[in-house]
């Protein structure tokens, strides 16, 4: 972690905040003593998992697709539709 004096922070605020944006943690000092810390804001725990590569962000927007449930009787949808259509005709 790097240290920045309050005086430097007042004079170069945008530069210090740019460093924080890049992920750097800054210790603020007053007369050589650390009095505060500026750390990058995190949107949540998911961001850290994405940055480490543990998870990947979704590629499709919207709700997640529901898992398919096997039909009773072992029929596929095509066979079931054929039977339903045949029953409607008579």
Curated annotation (Swiss-Prot):
One Gene Ontology term of the molecular function aspect: toxin sequestering activity
InterPro entries found in the cross-reference section: phD-YefM_TA_antitoxins (IPR051416), YefM-like_sf (IPR036165)
Keywords associated with the record: Toxin-antitoxin system
Family (UniProt): Belongs to the phD/YefM antitoxin family.
Function field: Antitoxin component of a type II toxin-antitoxin (TA) system. Upon expression in M.smegmatis neutralizes the effect of cognate toxin VapC35.
Organism: Mycobacterium tuberculosis (strain ATCC 25618 / H37Rv)
This protein's record includes keyword Nucleus: no
Highest taxon in the source lineage: Bacteria
GO biological process: positive regulation of growth
Protein name according to UniProt: Antitoxin VapB35
Region of interest (Disordered), ranges: 53-90
NCBIfam families: phd_fam
């Amino acid at each position: 972690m790097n240290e920045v004096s309050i005086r430097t922070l007042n004079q170069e605020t945008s530069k210090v905040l740019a460093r924080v944006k890049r992920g750097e943690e800054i210790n603020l000092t007053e007369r050589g003593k650390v009095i505060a810390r500026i750390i990058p804001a995190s949107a949540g725990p998911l961001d850290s998992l994405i940055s480490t590569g543990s998870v990947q962000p979704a590629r499709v927007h919207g709700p997640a697709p529901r898992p398919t449930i096997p039909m009773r009787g072992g029929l596929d949808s095509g066979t079931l539709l054929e039977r339903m259509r045949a029953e409607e005709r008579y």
